[in-house]
Amino acid sequence: MDQRQANGMSIAESQGSGQPQYSGTGRTGILPCQAISALWRDGEITATQPLTDDQIQPSSLDLRLGEVAYRVRASFLPGPGQNMAQKINQYTMHSVDLTRGAVLERGCVYIVPLLERLSLSQRLSAIANPKSSTGRLDVFTRLITDGASEFDRIDAGYHGPLYAEIAPRTFSILARTGARLNQMRLR
C-alpha cells in the first residue's frame, strides 16, 4: 500500500484498485479533486442528479441550483438549531420554477435549494464562495445550511441540504436548474 500526505490528509492507495482512500489526520488544507471524487463515491457528498465531469474542479466542487427559487423579503440565516425549510415556508412571498429557466429580478432576494447535500464526517468542514463568473455578472450569492449562523461556512460533521441565497444587483438574470453560481471547498 502506497502512502502519501496531501493537504493534511493521509492518502493510501489500495493495491490494485487505483482508488485513493482518504483518512483525516489534520485540517490544514483544501482537499484536491481526487479527495472530492472519493467523498462523492463514499456518499459524503450526494445529489438528486449525478455529478457532471466538469463539476469537480482542481480544489472545489461547483454547486448546482435546484428546481425552485423562493422569493423572500430579505436575506436571513436560520440560526442554531433552526431548519431552513421551515424558515423558507415562513418567509416565502412566492416561488419560481427553474426547470425551464426563469428570470430572477434585480433587487430581489431568492433562496434556492441546491441539488447537492452533505453527510460530512467530523473530520471535514467546508467554505463556499461565488464563482468568479457570478461576480462578473454582479449577482450576489451566498451559501446557507440548516442551523447556520454564518454565510458560506459549513461546520464539521454537517448532515443536510445546501441552499443558495441569490440577489441580482445590476441586471435581472435567467436562472435554471443545474446552473452553477457557487463553489465549495472542503477541508
What name fits each language-model region?
Residues 1-187:
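Non-catalytic terminal segments and appended small domains
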